[in-house]
Amino acid sequence: AASPHRAPVICAISGSGGCGKSTIVATMAHTSSLLGLRAAVLDLDLMFGNLYDLLGVDAPRDMAALIEPSAAGVLAEPDIVAASMRVAPGVTLWGPVAAPEQAELMARPVELLLDVLRRESDVVFIDTSVFWGDAVAAAVAASDRCLVVGDAAVSSATSASRVIELASRVGVPRTRMSAVFNRFGARGADEDVAMRFEIACALSSKIRIADGGQDL
C-alpha cells in the first residue's frame, strides 16, 4: 500500500529574539506559493506573534478557537478553517492566540492541527518564540528541518548553541538542523561574525541570507 502523504515540516528557532525568524518564515511561505505549493504556516509565538501582520492579514483569527474542539481528540475541518487566515493563493496561516494567557493550553490543539496539515498541505512552515512551551517543543520535535536562525547580535552565537542543545533534547538530530546566519553583509555582519556563529552552532548544514538593505 502507498504510504500516506506527509508534508515536510520546516521549523525556525532561535535563542534570541529579533533575528528575523518571522520574516524568513513569511518569505519561504510566499516563495513556496509561487512554486505552486500549498503552504501551511503556524505562528507559534503564541503570545506575541505578528506573522499575520507581516503577511498582510487585516483581521487576525484567534487560534485559541481550537482549544475546545480539540478536547474530543480530533479537529473537524470546519473548526480548522474557522481558525485559519487565507493569506494568498497557496498560503494559509494559523496563530497566534488573542489572549496570551491561553498559550499554555495550545499543546494539544497544535499537535492535532499539525497532524492534519501534514496530510492536507505540501509544506508546513512554523515560526516559534524564544520561550518554548509544550506546543513549541512538540512542533520542533516533529520537524523535518530545523532552521537555527541568528545574526550579528552579540549574544546570537551563544544563544544559538543553547537552543541547539534544547532541540537535541526534544529529539531533533543535529543532521536535521541548519545554521542560518541572517542579514549577512549588513554593518557588523561580516565574514568573521558569520563564521563565529557557524562555529558556535557546529552544524554541517550552513546557510547565509544576505542583507537586503534598508528598502526591504
Regions found by a protein language model. Name each.
Residues 32-92:
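Phosphate-binding loop that captures ATP/GTP phosphates
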